[in-house]
Amino acid sequence: MTELETALAEFLPTQRWFAGKGRVVAEVRVESSVPLRTALPSLSAVVAAVAYADGGVERYHVPVGHDRGLEARQLTDRASDAVIYETEGPKGGPIYDAARDERLGGVYLDLLSRAANVEELRFYRMPEWTETLRGPGRLLAAEQSNSSLVFGNRLILKLFRLLEPGENPELEVTRALAGAGFSACPAPLGWIEGLGSTLGILQPYYAGSVDGWKLATERVADHYESKDGEPGNFAEDAAALGRLTAELHGAMATALPKVAEGQPDLGRLSGRLLGQLTQVVALVPELADQREAIEEVYTKAEAAGGGSRHLQRIHGDYHLGQVLKVPEGSGEPRGGAPVDRGRWVVIDFEGEPARPLEERRRLASPLQDVAGMLRSFDYAAFQPLVLGEDPETPGPTRDELARFEGPAAAWIEANRKAFLDGYLTRAGDSGQALGGDHELLLRAFELDKAVYEVMYEARHRPPWLQIPLGGIRRLLGVSP
């Protein structure tokens, strides 16, 4: 391996967006290195193939910067984890992840504004992007699987790290929704393609917005502090989110592929649900007490089958963190045509990053998105009990959750009802047929989502484990 490849083999597993944590890296091979700026600080768009000891291969996009002198030292001092390796000699200096260098983010923006072609990379610009904006790109700290650069609180460039063949769903779906006239999501203003993959997408940035998770957990705190026992003041927002979700599903059904009523694939669905349940019970034996009851719900949902006959593209990773409350004046995605102000917008259409691209594109019941949001309400209600994500930090016990059950259940139920009322009313208005047995299917999807959460928390956030376990008990009507 070259010096860069050897260094990347050590560097990549340390990054938060690296998907192969826990796997042994056998080799890294640079497939492409396209110079985007040759003067210092220089920038190259690198695509590296990571081969694992177990035989798998993944491809990663790494913007690689190089600089020397005082500014280089200042960068490495404040972001030492961005350094890939150091070069020696009079022209030496750090080789680093350029997403951490605000000076170099503007190189991507300039190439997009000019719709440039640089070797095998293609930079596309939508005609709706009319404003001229230059300057540094500020890296958002909250990203997990990608890296996002914000320019002037107006634009956001999402750089995809783990690459898969074909068009990224974030680009595919938002472009289709924009074409269908759905304005409650960030329309693409430009994108980067190379080596058969989408490397990045430029979208409007909603400055001053607040995500649904933050807003909901603030309302939960208000609820627990109130003396009258009222379930907080999030229900109006929950109803608005329900209506928005139905509008989103209607737009996706119009703009993207769908399966007509009468073509269910319930056998595959039931097999997947039961397969995941078996896997999670082996990991968390505490779930074994509810296994029979969960299987009964799955069996009844398969036998009824009504709601699953409507299959279409869905969001696929839908929860309170994927919706933003946009303040007055925030976000002008088409250079002067602002989105509707003071309402919710939906973001992040990639689907669950851990799932293969083919699976994320698979047609599914829109009720899976509904189930995801309902489970998010459950998490928000119990979030104040969670002390942290450190595996060494003890989380709430089952008894502690039981003591919170009354006020938490009141908040959950109020917002579930508001969301579902909003969703079903708007879905009915738009002619979306959910089927007469949608409640049974929704319950099965909620249980499946909670079972997945049990597996995730057991592996990654043990202090949170009792939250999905408690959610399963509530869905089954089992006492806390």
What function would you assign to each model-found segment?
Residues 1, 329-336, 477-480:
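Actinobacteria-biased recognition of intrinsically disordered, low-complexity terminal regions
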Residues 1-27:
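Short Lys/Arg-enriched alpha/beta "domain-start" segment
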Residues 24-39, 47-49, 299-302:
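Short amphipathic beta-strand and strand-loop transition segments with alternating hydrophobic
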Residues 43-278, 328, 342-343, 347-409, ...:
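Conserved ATP-binding subdomain of kinase catalytic cores across diverse folds
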Residues 129-143, 284-329, 335-361, 431, ...:
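Flexible, glycine/threonine-enriched loop-and-boundary segments that flank and lead into catalytic domains
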Residues 260-299, 410-428, 455:
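Active-site catalytic-loop/activation-segment of kinase and kinase-like phosphoryl-transfer enzymes
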Residues 279-288, 309-314, 342-349, 357, ...:
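C-terminal amphipathic alpha-helical interaction region
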Residues 399-436, 440-480:
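ATP/Mg2+ or Mg2+-diphosphate-binding catalytic cores
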